[in-house]
């Protein structure tokens, strides 16, 4: 596990909400701007560079205070990546601040689109509410919305492929149905000029939303509902989800990652002043995640049969 050291004036951070400081690893020493993202006892941080020899611009250090396993968000990002959805890269770091141990953090770097163009949205609803596409949108997104709102099914099925990577959008929805986490996200343009959706970390910590009344994310005044009203797209979505549930969202596929990360956490847990659990309790969290995957798999299979 990488050791990360932050040096800054806590009073400046408390007074202004941001503080200048130093970010130190075995590889580099960099001046940074630090922002505290919440008021938890073990706080989460956003770190920004103006210039970096290693090319970093922003990273997020998440304390994962609401997840005693420290693994669920990392597993979600990794799962998105495995099924082909560009996602943030996450790893573990052990953080010290001004020489004092703060403990294990999830170190997250957002996906950088190849085209360097992206459109952030102000929602964590993965179905993409159509209200997002308003007059304040970019010209491209506004044109996209006009197509969705006015085109008939046949025209939409034909022309939407000029604007949206439909398969990747469906995989984005499937990733959300499986992981059942809360994510902010951004629209990105790929090299062929088509939109895709990528989960992202922001300064605000995403709040988990529940869609148990709509577990397959097919309802509402949303982009997903509009596309899935077309039989060919609904069939494609069904096939993709069936394949993901069979091949990717499985104990066999995900347990090696969970085991590896669990061992990494256990090696540093005793030095984390905020981890109060015994080794047995930490081990139990690993078992809980595997049980959750199995239960979610069964739940989604039952709903998929009615799609």
From Swiss-Prot:
Q: At the top level of its lineage, which domain of life is listed?
A: Bacteria
Keyword set, alphabetical order? Sporulation
Protein's cellular compartments? Spore coat
Q: Its GO biological process terms?
A: sporulation resulting in formation of a cellular spore
Q: What does this protein do?
A: Involved in the assembly of several proteins in the inner and outer layer of the spore coat.
The record's comment on protein family reads: Belongs to the CotH family.
- Could you tell me which PANTHER family the record lists for this protein? INNER SPORE COAT PROTEIN H
In Swiss-Prot or TrEMBL terms, this protein is called: Inner spore coat protein H-like protein
The species is: Bacillus subtilis (strain 168)
Q: Which gene encodes it?
A: yisJ
């Amino acid at each position: 596990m990488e050791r990360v050291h932050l040096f800054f004036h806590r009073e400046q951070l408390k007074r202004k909400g941001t503080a200048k400081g130093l970010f130190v690893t075995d590889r580099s020493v960099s001046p940074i701007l630090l922002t505290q993202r919440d008021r938890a006892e073990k706080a989460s941080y956003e770190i920004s560079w103006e210039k970096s020899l290693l090319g970093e611009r922003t990273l997020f250090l998440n304390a994962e205070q609401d997840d005693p396993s420290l693994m669920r968000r990392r597993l979600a990002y990794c799962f998105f990546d495995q099924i082909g959805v560009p996602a943030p890269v996450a790893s573990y770091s052990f953080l010290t601040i001004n020489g004092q141990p703060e403990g294990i953090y999830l170190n997250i770097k957002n996906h950088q689109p190849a085209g360097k163009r992206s459109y952030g949205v102000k929602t964590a609803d993965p179905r993409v509410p159509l209200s997002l596409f308003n007059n304040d949108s970019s010209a491209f997104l506004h044109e996209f919305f006009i197509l969705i709102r006015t085109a008939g099914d046949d025209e939409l099925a034909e022309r939407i492929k000029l604007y949206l990577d439909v398969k990747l959008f469906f995989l984005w929805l499937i990733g959300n149905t499986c992981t059942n986490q809360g994510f902010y996200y951004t629209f990105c343009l790929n090299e062929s000029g088509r939109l895709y959706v990528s989960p992202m970390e922001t300064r605000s910590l995403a709040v988990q939303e529940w869609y148990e009344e709509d577990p397959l994310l097919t309802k509402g005044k949303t982009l997903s509902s509009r596309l899935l009203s077309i039989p060919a797209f609904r069939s494609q979505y069904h096939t993709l989800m069936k394949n993901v549930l069979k091949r990717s969202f499985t104990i066999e596929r995900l347990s090696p990652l969970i085991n590896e990360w669990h061992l990494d956490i256990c090696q540093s847990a005793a030095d984390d002043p905020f981890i109060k659990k015994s080794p047995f309790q930490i081990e139990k969290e690993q078992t809980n995640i595997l049980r959750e995957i199995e239960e979610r798999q069964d739940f989604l299979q039952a709903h998929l049969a009615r799609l």
